[in-house]
């Protein structure tokens, strides 16, 4: 029987709410954070375009099991629309496809905002990760194909002007549901205003339940990163190698359960926790314990233990976390 290889890295679990700089791709960001923390496993909750900056929640270790909950959270973006040009990618990266000399007044833009609030229908950009017949739309677009991407419904909770620096640009903030393309908002508003438009700056500031106060920059992470052991000229670690102290870096990690604020949370006793660790159901005690829930999580000593459901006052685990 083949022996299973030992995992590389530390078994650290939790969330790093990374303030991604412009120019860095989401996959590149995950690799960088995984390397800095020397983590066994890492993943992100929601792609952020290389040209965009801001919040990219990165899950380490067992927090990767909670990624779907973070991806479903409401997003908040601040963005700038430059009027007068529609571009192939709906942002600065693309080539101009339509132009106009018209520039909208602040009053015209404000009058349009109610049309983009609530449940709206939008067509994702040609350059997007949407799959068309099994292929990514951006791959087809790069090959010169114009593809028909079906419109889909998204929800805009809030859209407001936050700046009007000059006639060419308007700054907005939007609070929206999963699946909303801000580039499509800019394109469609430009068309409705008769002047065309594209995104010239985009920053994500929230992915619920995380806020901008949770974000950490690359500089802050690197400032407390424990250096690698010194090596000789042949590339071998000089012995005895000092033990690396990750405590300052690990202090920037948010608890795995933070992504589950949307679920009912029930604390368990030590005896109940042991039963759940073994995959067994437990009867919930206490006046505040829910009798029914399609999804809920339980904790032990303040740490996330499991996600499951509650039926007739009994918690039944579906996913157990070893860190609990």
From Swiss-Prot:
Keyword Phosphoprotein tagged: no
Secretion signal, residue range per the UniProt entry: none
Gene label: truB
Family, similarity comment: Belongs to the pseudouridine synthase TruB family. Type 1 subfamily.
Record: active site: 49
Classification lineage: Bacteria, Pseudomonadati, Pseudomonadota, Alphaproteobacteria, Hyphomicrobiales
Protein name: tRNA pseudouridine synthase B
Catalytic activity: uridine(55) in tRNA = pseudouridine(55) in tRNA
Biological process (GO), any one: tRNA pseudouridine synthesis
